[in-house]
Design a protein with these regions (language model features):
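Secondary-structure junction motif
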Residues: 195-217, 286-296, 301-307
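Beta-alpha-beta core module
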Residues: 157-164, 168, 183, 190, ...
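N-terminal short secondary-structure element
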Residues: 1-35, 39, 67-69, 80, ...
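Hydrophobic hinge/microswitch elements
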Residues: 133-146, 151-152, 202-263
Length: 307
C-alpha cells in the first residue's frame, strides 16, 4: 500500500518554497527547524526522489521535480481547506477565519467603518487582514493564501468571481491658488496641460486615474520624477504646489485632505469613478458567505462615502 504524504508534510514543503529559509519556514508552520527538516527528509524518502538540491550549500534550491511537487502540494492543501470550509459554511455561515486582502487605497479609509460593523453583524467571524497591491493580492488569492479580496475595479482580477458594492467617485484636488478653483466642475480636457501627480506603478488607482483622463500609462504621470507610494503623500505633494491629483471620494470622506487647504472639485462627464467590490476564487465553498458579505458592505460603504 502506498504511503501518502501527510498534510503537515505538504505544509512544510509549501512554507519552504515561499520563504526559501528553513528557520522562517519552521516559524511559519509553528514547529522547530529540526522538525521541519526531518519532515521534508521523510517526504523525500517516502516519494523516493530529491526535492531539494543538497549540493547548493546553505541556499535553499529546489530540483525541477521539487518545484512541480510544490505546486501540486499547494493544490492538494487548497482542496483539503475547501473540504473544511464547505463543512463550516454549512454548519455555521459567516463564522470562523476569513483571510481578507485589501488594497492600500481602500484599507485605511474603509476599515475603520467596516471592522466595527462586521464585528457587530458577524461576531463569530475572525478576520485576518493583508494589505498589498492588486496584483500581489490576486496572486495570493489564486494560490489559496487569501480567501477574499476588497478591490477597486476596473482591474485584472485573474478570473475571480466578483460582486460590486459601491461606486467611488473621483475628485480633483487643487492647491487653493490654482486657476481651476473657480470652476464648479472640471472638464477632463482642462487637465491636458496640468501636471497630474499619480501613485507609482503597481497601484491600480494609477491606471484608473489615467483611464478617467483618457490617457495611457506612458503618456502622463511621474513628470520630472514625481510619483507617490500613498494617497497621503500625493495630498502633501499637491499642497506643496507640485501639481494636481485625483482622489477617490472614499479617502476624502475619511478626512485625507483635512487641514491642507486643498480645494476639491468633481470631474465633468461620465465615468469618473472606480467600483469597489469583492473578489474570490471561482466555485469557492463559501461563495454564499462572500455574497452575503457583499450585500452587507453596500450599507457600510454608503456610510463611509458620505462627505
Amino acid at each position: 500500500m502506498t504511503i501518502l504524504p501527510s498534510p503537515q508534510q505538504l505544509r512544510y514543503l509549501v512554507a519552504l518554497a515561499e520563504t526559501r529559509h528553513f528557520g522562517r519556514a519552521a516559524q511559519a508552520c509553528t514547529v522547530t527547524q529540526s522538525t521541519l527538516s526531518a519532515g521534508l527528509l521523510a517526504l523525500e524518502r517516502q516519494l523516493d526522489c530529491h526535492i531539494l538540491d543538497r549540493g547548493a550549500g546553505r541556499h535553499v534550491v529546489f530540483t525541477p521535480l521539487g518545484l512541480e511537487l510544490v505546486e501540486r502540494a499547494r493544490t492538494a492543501l487548497s482542496t483539503l481547506e475547501a473540504v473544511t470550509e464547505a463543512a463550516m459554511a454549512a454548519r455555521e455561515p459567516m463564522a470562523g477565519p476569513l483571510r481578507l486582502g485589501v488594497i492600500p487605497t481602500i484599507g485605511p479609509f474603509l476599515l475603520p467603518t467596516l471592522m466595527p460593523a462586521l464585528r457587530e453583524a458577524f461576531p463569530r467571524l475572525r478576520l485576518y487582514l493583508r494589505e498589498d497591491t492588486t496584483a500581489n493580492l490576486v496572486d495570493r488569492l489564486t494560490a489559496s493564501r487569501l480567501d477574499l479580496l476588497l478591490l477597486a475595479t476596473p482591474c485584472d482580477c485573474g478570473g475571480a468571481d466578483t460582486v460590486p458594492v459601491a461606486r467611488d467617485m473621483f475628485l480633483i484636488a487643487l492647491p487653493p491658488s490654482h486657476r481651476l478653483v473657480g470652476e464648479e466642475q472640471i472638464p477632463v480636457s482642462a487637465l491636458a496641460t496640468e501636471r497630474l501627480l499619480l501613485l507609482e506603478d503597481g497601484h491600480c488607482l494609477r491606471d484608473q486615474a489615467l483611464a478617467v483622463c483618457g490617457l495611457l500609462a506612458g503618456d502622463r504621470g511621474d513628470q520630472d520624477g514625481f510619483a507617490a507610494t500613498s494617497l497621503h503623500t500625493l495630498v502633501q505633494m499637491v499642497a506643496s504646489g507640485l501639481g494636481i491629483t485625483l482622489l477617490p471620494r472614499l479617502a476624502v470622506a475619511a478626512g485625507i485632505t483635512k487641514g491642507t487647504g486643498l480645494v476639491l472639485r468633481p470631474l465633468a462627464g461620465p465615468g469618473a469613478w472606480r467600483t469597489l467590490g469583492l473578489a474570490w476564487r471561482p466555485n469557492a465553498p463559501r461563495s454564499a458567505d462572500y455574497r452575503a458579505l457583499g450585500t452587507h458592505l453596500v450599507d457600510t460603504c454608503r456610510e463611509a462615502l458620505e462627505l
